[in-house]
């Protein structure tokens, strides 16, 4: 079953035992179609079922009522609450495809979102996302990235979008030494920087392999790779490579940083908040919570609590799954 690509050991949401899609579909129908919406029932059912189970509810709902659950939720709910509830019933690859489309639509491109999605998804996930993107928009993800970005940033994004990163857990010490030297020769050691070498190594090697490479890099250059990237590169390309380094070292910490960014300051970036909470809820949200507490001195739960309100707050806290 394809869903296993999207499930990890450290999620806050798991399969619901004794799951019965027709019972759930009926309860949801009642919650939507009664006088006034019973938000509590909707929240409880959708946050206590895995995405694979929600897909079965969507199917059952369509068969029983000849009505799309998504359309009914959209018709009945509104605002950020509606967005997160619709996200919950969307298959993961389709959800990511939509988020990528949204980040490239209209005036200006949301580079941070492109970087976040493309650096945190596995190669196999990227292949599914590209398929979902084509199915939804009849356009290649590659082509849209190409027309919305440029230069070395574009090249690196396309390399990631192709899903060519090695996924094996084997590490090759000789290759790590060689790559570390290549990075050093391409940056610190020469006048000007050979950006292609950075893209090739950072966007194609496996995370375990890169970890070893970064250790070797420090031995050769007496510098941390992050400092070299900051010194040698600039703009969105620099941001992307720094994100790769941070994900290599600790993906949950990188995503905790993104959540902190989304929650701090005057406004809340609900687009990012919804995306990370929903997309990591069955993968590593427990680890993200731990990193959030460690780095920012308060729990993710309390940060969400103080920054959101109403049913929107309730559903996010349910996904969060507990206070730390």
Curated annotation (Swiss-Prot):
The modification Phosphothreonine is found at residue 268. GO terms for molecular function: calcium ion binding; calcium-dependent phospholipid binding; calcium-dependent protein binding; phosphatidylserine binding; phospholipase A2 inhibitor activity. The keyword Repeat applies. One of its GO terms (biological process) is neutrophil degranulation. GO terms for cellular component: axon; cytoplasm; dendrite; membrane; neuronal cell body; nucleus; phagocytic vesicle membrane; plasma membrane. Annexin repeats lie at residues 19-90, 91-162, 174-246, 250-321. InterPro entries: Annexin, Annexin_repeat, Annexin_repeat_CS, Annexin_sf, ANX3. Keywords: Acetylation, Annexin, Calcium, Calcium/phospholipid-binding, Phospholipase A2 inhibitor, Phosphoprotein, Repeat. Inhibitor of phospholipase A2, also possesses anti-coagulant properties. A pair of annexin repeats may form one binding site for calcium and phospholipid. This is Annexin A3. It comes from Rattus norvegicus (Rat).
């Amino acid at each position: 079953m394809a869903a296993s690509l999207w499930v990890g050991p450290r999620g806050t949401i798991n399969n619901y035992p004794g799951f019965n899609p027709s019972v759930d579909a009926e309860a949801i129908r009642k919650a939507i179609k009664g006088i006034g919406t019973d938000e509590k029932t909707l929240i409880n059912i959708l946050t206590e079922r895995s995405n694979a189970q929600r897909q079965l509810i969507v199917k059952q709902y369509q068969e029983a009522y000849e009505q799309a659950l998504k359309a009914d939720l959209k018709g009945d709910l509104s605002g950020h609450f509606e967005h997160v509830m619709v996200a919950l019933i969307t298959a993961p690859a389709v959800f990511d495809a939509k988020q990528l489309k949204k980040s490239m639509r209209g005036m200006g491109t949301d580079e941070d979102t492109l970087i976040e999605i493309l650096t945190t998804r596995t190669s196999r996930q990227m292949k599914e996302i590209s398929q979902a993107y084509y199915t939804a928009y009849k356009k290649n993800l590659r082509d849209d990235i190409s027309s919305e970005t440029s230069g070395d940033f574009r090249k690196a994004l396309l390399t990631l979008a192709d899903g060519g990163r090695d996924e094996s857990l084997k590490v090759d010490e000789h290759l790590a030494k060689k790559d570390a030297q290549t990075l050093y020769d391409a940056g610190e050691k020469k006048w000007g920087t050979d950006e292609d070498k950075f893209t090739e190594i950072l966007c194609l090697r496996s995370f375990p392999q890169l970890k070893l490479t970064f250790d070797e890099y420090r031995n050769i250059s007496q510098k941390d790779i992050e400092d070299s990237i900051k010194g040698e590169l600039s703009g969105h390309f620099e941001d992307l490579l720094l994100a790769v380094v941070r994900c290599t070292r600790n993906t949950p910490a990188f995503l905790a940083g993104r959540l902190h960014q989304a929650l701090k300051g005057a406004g809340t970036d609900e687009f990012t908040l919804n995306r990370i909470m929903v997309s990591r809820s069955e993968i590593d949200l427990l680890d993200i919570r731990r990193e959030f507490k460690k780095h920012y001195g308060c729990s993710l739960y309390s940060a969400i609590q103080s920054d959101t309100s109403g049913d929107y707050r309730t559903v996010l806290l349910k996904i969060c799954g507990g206070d730390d």
